[in-house]
Amino acid sequence: MFHPIEEALEALKKGEVIIVVDDEDRENEGDFVALAEHATPEVVNFMATHGRGLICTPLSEDIAGRLDLHPMVDHNTDSHETAFTVSIDHRLTKTGISAQERSFTIQALLNEESVSDDFQRPGHIFPLIAKKGGVLKRAGHTEAAVDLAKACGSQGAGVICEIMNEDGTMARVPELAEIAERHQLKMITIKDLIEYRYNITTLVNREVDITLPTDFGTFRVYGYTNEVDGKEHLAFVMGDVPFNSEPVLVRVHSECLTGDVFASHRCDCGPQLHAALAQIAEEGRGVLLYLRQEGRGIGLINKLKAYRLQEQGYDTVEANEALGFLPDLRNYGIGAQILRDLGVQHMKLLTNNPRKIAGLEGYGLSISERVPLQMEASEHNKQYLQTKMKKLGHLLHF
């Protein structure tokens, strides 16, 4: 049903329209997407006729800044923070609404000689400003269009249009698949685009490395920063870097302040952290990644709010969902990049979570063995662990 990102890029370079599908837990919709440079009157008319949604022009911050395209509102209350600017028409257009005139306005946005005064406001083209960092910062169609344009070697600008059914309802994946087949279009997901970007773009910088004696032995600690969100991550390493081709014992541990530092009994994070360090030290060779993904990615304060809901009878999954989050928001692309930087090619992964295995293998790393890391349950965390086993698929035994 979905095509590889590489095939979609080739189609875009040829001037074709593709379909980009959002995550089912976000807007769960599909947009027609084309490169702005290929937004001919025929492409605009195709989107208007078969998409029926609003035709918008996602732009990089640089292009929007050069043309003084300011936000439509001072206080954006849209649930997805879609960054509309004031709508525009080129001053040489008449009504600005025809496919020919909308195409003309879009092409003028790409002209490096265009200036702000070349456009009148409001108009019939709706520019959108993509966030710096693209889909790795915000998983929206705006960012997807700009990321795809840049991946094609084009300017950071695209054209998008939401796809609606003939009855006016939003087209979902089954209908989108029919539309793609009918018009012979490539169809991709933003999720796959995120994975593609993690694989082709180096987003971590090794900032420092030091020797750290611990209760478990002496480790070499490497500090990394993420270019997209500025978060800082650590790698505790025992053994020589870069590693050779032999499988390395690896633990990917997400930050848990309450468990790691304050010995909370609500989870098993602290004991898992210590057990992993001990096992790596015993083996004499390995890596523990400490990723800043507190609360399975929802952050410390939201994790505490989830705890409060658990006190009212929710389990850990239900609490996340009640707060508007997925059960697990963690992404392992940054971790995979750190492991690659350390020369890890093959690993034995310390985990009870099969999704973590799939997450790392999705970024081209080889996992030869899963090494269980089950801690003894307590009266305080037994239900939590049972929920992870039943609802999140963790491989635990009681």
Swiss-Prot record:
<feature type="binding site">
    <location>
        <begin position="251"/>
        <end position="255"/>
    </location>
    <ligand>
        <name>GTP</name>
    </ligand>
</feature>
<feature type="binding site">
    <location>
        <begin position="26"/>
        <end position="27"/>
    </location>
    <ligand>
        <name>D-ribulose 5-phosphate</name>
    </ligand>
</feature>
<keyword id="KW-0547">Nucleotide-binding</keyword>
<keyword id="KW-0479">Metal-binding</keyword>
<dbReference type="GO" id="GO:0009231">
    <property type="term" value="P:riboflavin biosynthetic process"/>
</dbReference>
<comment type="function">
    <text>Catalyzes the conversion of GTP to 2,5-diamino-6-ribosylamino-4(3H)-pyrimidinone 5'-phosphate (DARP), formate and pyrophosphate.</text>
</comment>
<dbReference type="GO" id="GO:0003935">
    <property type="term" value="F:GTP cyclohydrolase II activity"/>
</dbReference>
<dbReference type="Pfam" id="PF00926">
    <property type="entry name" value="DHBP_synthase"/>
</dbReference>
<comment type="function">
    <text>Catalyzes the conversion of D-ribulose 5-phosphate to formate and 3,4-dihydroxy-2-butanone 4-phosphate.</text>
</comment>
<dbReference type="GO" id="GO:0005525">
    <property type="term" value="F:GTP binding"/>
</dbReference>
<feature type="binding site">
    <location>
        <position position="267"/>
    </location>
    <ligand>
        <name>Zn(2+)</name>
    </ligand>
</feature>
<keyword id="KW-0378">Hydrolase</keyword>
<feature type="binding site">
    <location>
        <position position="141"/>
    </location>
    <ligand>
        <name>Mg(2+) 2</name>
    </ligand>
</feature>
<comment type="similarity">
    <text>In the N-terminal section; belongs to the DHBP synthase family.</text>
</comment>
<protein>
    <recommendedName>
        <fullName>Riboflavin biosynthesis protein RibBA</fullName>
        <ecNumber>4.1.99.12</ecNumber>
        <ecNumber>3.5.4.25</ecNumber>
    </recommendedName>
</protein>
<feature type="region of interest" description="GTP cyclohydrolase II">
    <location>
        <begin position="200"/>
        <end position="398"/>
    </location>
</feature>
<dbReference type="InterPro" id="IPR000422">
    <property type="entry name" value="DHBP_synthase_RibB"/>
</dbReference>
<dbReference type="InterPro" id="IPR000926">
    <property type="entry name" value="RibA"/>
</dbReference>
<comment type="pathway">
    <text>Cofactor biosynthesis; riboflavin biosynthesis; 5-amino-6-(D-ribitylamino)uracil from GTP: step 1/4.</text>
</comment>
<feature type="binding site">
    <location>
        <position position="351"/>
    </location>
    <ligand>
        <name>GTP</name>
    </ligand>
</feature>
<feature type="binding site">
    <location>
        <position position="316"/>
    </location>
    <ligand>
        <name>GTP</name>
    </ligand>
</feature>
<keyword id="KW-0342">GTP-binding</keyword>
<dbReference type="InterPro" id="IPR032677">
    <property type="entry name" value="GTP_cyclohydro_II"/>
</dbReference>
<dbReference type="InterPro" id="IPR036144">
    <property type="entry name" value="RibA-like_sf"/>
</dbReference>
<feature type="binding site">
    <location>
        <position position="256"/>
    </location>
    <ligand>
        <name>Zn(2+)</name>
    </ligand>
</feature>
<feature type="site" description="Essential for DHBP synthase activity">
    <location>
        <position position="124"/>
    </location>
</feature>
<feature type="binding site">
    <location>
        <begin position="138"/>
        <end position="142"/>
    </location>
    <ligand>
        <name>D-ribulose 5-phosphate</name>
    </ligand>
</feature>
<feature type="region of interest" description="DHBP synthase">
    <location>
        <begin position="1"/>
        <end position="199"/>
    </location>
</feature>
<feature type="binding site">
    <location>
        <position position="162"/>
    </location>
    <ligand>
        <name>D-ribulose 5-phosphate</name>
    </ligand>
</feature>
<keyword id="KW-0862">Zinc</keyword>
<feature type="active site" description="Proton acceptor; for GTP cyclohydrolase activity">
    <location>
        <position position="328"/>
    </location>
</feature>
<feature type="binding site">
    <location>
        <position position="272"/>
    </location>
    <ligand>
        <name>GTP</name>
    </ligand>
</feature>
<keyword id="KW-0460">Magnesium</keyword>
<feature type="binding site">
    <location>
        <position position="356"/>
    </location>
    <ligand>
        <name>GTP</name>
    </ligand>
</feature>
<dbReference type="Pfam" id="PF00925">
    <property type="entry name" value="GTP_cyclohydro2"/>
</dbReference>
<dbReference type="GO" id="GO:0008270">
    <property type="term" value="F:zinc ion binding"/>
</dbReference>
<feature type="binding site">
    <location>
        <position position="269"/>
    </location>
    <ligand>
        <name>Zn(2+)</name>
    </ligand>
</feature>
<comment type="pathway">
    <text>Cofactor biosynthesis; riboflavin biosynthesis; 2-hydroxy-3-oxobutyl phosphate from D-ribulose 5-phosphate: step 1/1.</text>
</comment>
<feature type="binding site">
    <location>
        <position position="31"/>
    </location>
    <ligand>
        <name>D-ribulose 5-phosphate</name>
    </ligand>
</feature>
<keyword id="KW-0511">Multifunctional enzyme</keyword>
<comment type="similarity">
    <text>In the C-terminal section; belongs to the GTP cyclohydrolase II family.</text>
</comment>
<feature type="binding site">
    <location>
        <position position="27"/>
    </location>
    <ligand>
        <name>Mg(2+) 2</name>
    </ligand>
</feature>
